[in-house]
């Protein structure tokens, strides 16, 4: 559902021109063949740039980005994470994924390879909303913490939680849950944060 924000580039809102939109093949097809998204392309509000699984894009002399597929609902498009490489540091960006165990890679090993790991923290635990959590699959923060339980403080400190549902109590900076998680060595992204790459 995150693609819905593209509508704000159209003539009803910003009326932008040629905003680059990096899209995997299935997402490109969806945007090209469905309204109102195809109108954004026809009116040149957005310009689709093709990306491929595990194919590195060099954005400039200081920044490389590699998209990779992750398992998620995928009703309308692929779901991807990104490895982002700067001149000094590297980050992992996975805002959406079903569960860590459904991915064909070890999240622990992938985190160890980077300086920062921005990870899906949609829900704190399975009791957060009053419906079947299988309808909105995401790794609970508590599951991620359990996976990293025996890892070093340095490894835990690379994990920066992002992508919170409004029901997640850890979204609140002064919540008991957030403070307990931070004591374990994990971090939370905040609006205005900057991370050197």
Predicted segments, located by residue:
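Phosphate- and divalent-cation-binding pockets in alpha/beta enzyme and binding domains
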Residues: 2-5, 30-31, 170
């Amino acid at each position: 559902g995150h693609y819905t924000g593209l509508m704000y580039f159209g003539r009803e809102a910003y009326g932008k021109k040629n905003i680059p939109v990096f899209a995997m093949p299935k997402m490109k097809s969806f945007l090209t063949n469905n309204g109102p998204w195809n109108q954004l392309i026809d009116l040149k509000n957005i310009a689709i740039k093709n990306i491929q699984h595990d194919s590195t894009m060099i954005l400039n002399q200081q920044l490389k980005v590699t998209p990779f597929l992750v398992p998620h609902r995928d009703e309308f498009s692929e779901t991807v994470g990104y490895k982002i490489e700067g001149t000094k540091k590297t980050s992992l960006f996975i805002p959406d994924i079903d569960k860590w165990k459904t991915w064909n890679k070890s999240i622990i090993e992938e985190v160890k390879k980077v300086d920062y790991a921005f990870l899906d923290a949609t829900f704190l635990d399975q009791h957060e909303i009053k419906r079947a959590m299988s309808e909105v699959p995401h790794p609970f923060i508590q599951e991620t913490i359990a996976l990293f339980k025996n890892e070093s403080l340095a490894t835990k400190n690379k994990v920066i939680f992002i992508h919170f549902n409004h029901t997640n109590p850890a979204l609140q900076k002064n919540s008991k849950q957030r403070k307990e998680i931070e004591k374990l060595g994990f971090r939370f992204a905040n609006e205005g944060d900057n991370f050197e790459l």
